Amino acid sequence: MKRRNALIAAGLAAAALAGCKTTGDIVVQQGVGITALRSVCPAVGIPEFTGDITLFSPAGSVTADAMDVTATITNVRSNCDDSGDEVFSSATFEVQAMRRNTSGARSVELPYFSSVVRGGSSVVAKRVGTVTLNFADGQARASAMGTAGAVVNRAEATLPPDIRQRITRPRRAGDNDAAVDPLTEPDIRAALARANFELLVGFQLSEDQLAYNVTR
């Protein structure tokens, strides 16, 4: 039981802390100076262990022959409007599913979450929705689309001018701080974390479902 709880905790931590690198992230060129800064648009991604869900029948079993429905979140796409004081980010994704028993038409509702995460760990907003998968009689596969959105204050997602200057200032050989990586300085790291927002989507899993994903 202790091992199982530890694995669940590890999975939850990974889901909360998982981040996604996208165009606009900080780029270090040859270890000297910073050549680009991150966008104010939230990065969009799927936290580890939350992109898959398995339903079992009977519900208490977790063996391969008891798998009823399996589903995966894929084809995540995002759009961002950063033209105003509020940054609007939206995402669409596809849920692809398979079922074991293809007899009869069937609808399956799967819950999913969309969270706005700040600094890699602080959840500032969360919404839970559902996607409905409609299997036709004799059909093993079905798919459905889901949506997510986030609104971020532009000022909160923007680095202060002094921090930007310290990060992007060219460093030349002979400078006292030429060998110092600005990203290692505590106040700069803290400012970067405060300005970092992510829009994360995944299945809203029970503890047992999360444990299964972590340990399989």
Where are these regions (language model features)?
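Post-signal peptide N-terminal segment of mature Sec-exported envelope proteins
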Residues: Q29-F56
